[in-house]
Amino acid sequence: MTTISDLPYDLVKEIFSWVPFTSLRAVRSTCKTWNALSKNQIFGKKSVARNQFLELMILDSRVCSLRFDLQKIRNEDEEDLVDPSMKQISIPNNDDQVEISRVYHCDGLLLCIPKDNSSLMLWNPYLGQTKRIRPKNTFHRDDSFALGYNNRNHKILRLNEENESHIDVYDFSSDSWRTVPDDNPYRDELIYQSGVSLKGNAYFFDREVTTEAEVGTEDLLITGIEDYLRCFDFTTERFGPRLPLPFILPSPSFEYLALSWARDDKLAVLYSHYDTFDIIEIWISTKIEPNAVSWSTFLKVDMSLINGLTDDFLIRFEPKSFFIDEEKKVAVLFDTKVTETCRYQMAYIVGDDGYFKSVNIGVISNSHWIGGELVRSSYVPSLLQLQV
């Protein structure tokens, strides 16, 4: 009798190419041969290529997968459907269900930061492998991290606001931490939580604040705020020069910014100024290196022109994370919606032609009502072994 283990390789390959990332564990469990095959090569490239964006989000201190199917938006022949689905992902070897506060991503690997700051947890979701990383010195709540690599040797960057003259780097090849000097003269201006990994390096927002003394007092007045981009190069283990952002900033400038990854190794940056809070601009990089960047406009949206949006919504609207779909020419912006009894995680799909659609992802149930943080859009698997 023929069994599933007897199926031709090409057919097995085709089957796996259509399996969603979140269902791999169940499919692997059906057959030892399938389990071995899927852990030696990546079959899911076809599903990645489709317009089903697989996002990873932290919600209620748990890592969740959030799948958006944008194929049917702007489709005149069919109903305008998005149909998102969210699912909590169980972290292997996490029997005590450690709560996660932040997650950093690089090329299919996730670096999970537990709330108790006792250790780091490196996770390869595709292979179902984890690795605990103990600190050289005690981790702190305000530490920030980033994942990167040089010559395929992965590393972890640790930034500590209390120690601005040194940085800590964890090297996978030696399984150890080392402290290296940091000669970055603007380290105190880095916006630590903004780090995004791209092509093996990590990019952060950098802010320069200028002040002058107020006449007759000892107070300082802010006269200007300028934002830049800075790259941490994991090959040299140094920060590069300040890189320009594409906006013309008023002075003094008070705005909110968000940084995201776009397909084909590009960065996307979102900008909105508090004086014109209803205007949202998104730009994408046309060139991005540790010491150089150039930008092109992706879209500019005047939210006040969208029918049905109230002034109260526009004032409170502050998307903390986003991703873009270049083919559909839309951006998906993540924010929270507050009612008298609940807080909801929301996604807002916007286009520069006035297209707008709101999507209720679910109720935020944690006691602090903290909204979800988008970790990564268009997750692509990795075959890097964490357990040798």
Curated annotation (Swiss-Prot):
One family name in Pfam for this protein: FBA_1
Boundaries of every F-box domain copy: 1-47
InterPro entries: F-box-assoc_dom_typ1, F-box-assoc_interact_dom, F-box-like_dom_sf, F-box_dom, Gal_Oxase/kelch_b-propeller, SCF_F-box_component
Stored Gene3D superfamilies: 1.20.1280.50
Protein name stated in the entry: Putative F-box protein At3g49520
Species of provenance: Arabidopsis thaliana (Mouse-ear cress)
